[in-house]
Amino acid sequence: MTTRTPLMAGNWKMNLNHLEAIAHVQKLAFALADKDYDAVEVAVLAPFTDLRSVQTLVDGDKLKIKYGAQDISAHDGGAYTGEISGPMLAKLKCTYVAVGHSERRQYHAETDEIVNAKVKAAYKHGLTPILCVGEELDVREAGNHVEHTLAQVEGGLKDLAAEQAESVVIAYEPVWAIGTGKVCGADDAQEVCAAIRGKLAELYSQELADKVRIQYGGSVKSGNVAEIMAKPDIDGALVGGASLDSDEFVKIVRFRDQ
């Protein structure tokens, strides 16, 4: 079976200005520098206004931390006020971009069709999309959470070639567990992540499915990350609030030490 390097990505959301971002990344880099952490890939998803500062710091100090954006326009440029394009993010040397986060779906009415267009825009410009999927509480309580999430996966990857799909990162984030303190149990998270891998095998091949990293997101903390990461189909975490505390995020990155 393919060995998948865990990806721990901190989604800062609308937090940290560019000066705070520099200090935060410096703290992370310093805390991780005393031990080789190649076994875990670390990334931060910063607000657009922070990206140039993060790029300068990462390039200048040759840091191993990857970085990316929290959204991308489906368009390459033009009269789209407030949008940020793939070419702009590529010029900033972003590695990742989150696509279809539940907050984008909820507050900006992003449909699977829009998310799919953004996934394609990311690949067009050499960015790796972190495709976010997951159900609301009513869907979970009705027992339709797997079906709902797999429909989002299929919609997000529609018409995507295998050579692109094999590098996608999929983040399963049950909406009811994001920022609420409620945590989806490790077994429940594994159920959905295993189903996502099964859907990838159905859409493409088992070989491709075994390559794709599937993250869990939703109130991930140092106290629960080891149990979550012990599951066979969970390959990392998309960390929200806890990623704003550098000490806490380092503990999450080093889940194997717990």
UniProtKB/Swiss-Prot annotation:
Its EC number is 5.3.1.1. Disulfide bonds: none annotated. Its main location: cytoplasm. HAMAP family: TIM_B. Belongs to the triosephosphate isomerase family. SUPFAM superfamilies: Triosephosphate isomerase (TIM). It catalyses: D-glyceraldehyde 3-phosphate = dihydroxyacetone phosphate. This is Triosephosphate isomerase. NCBIfam families: tim (TIGR00419). It is found in: Cytoplasm. The active site is at H101, E173. Keywords: Cytoplasm, Gluconeogenesis, Glycolysis, Isomerase. Pathway: Carbohydrate biosynthesis; gluconeogenesis; Carbohydrate degradation; glycolysis; D-glyceraldehyde 3-phosphate from glycerone phosphate: step 1/1. It is an enzyme of class 5 (isomerase). The keyword Cytoplasm applies. Homodimer. It comes from the Bacteria. Pfam families: TIM.
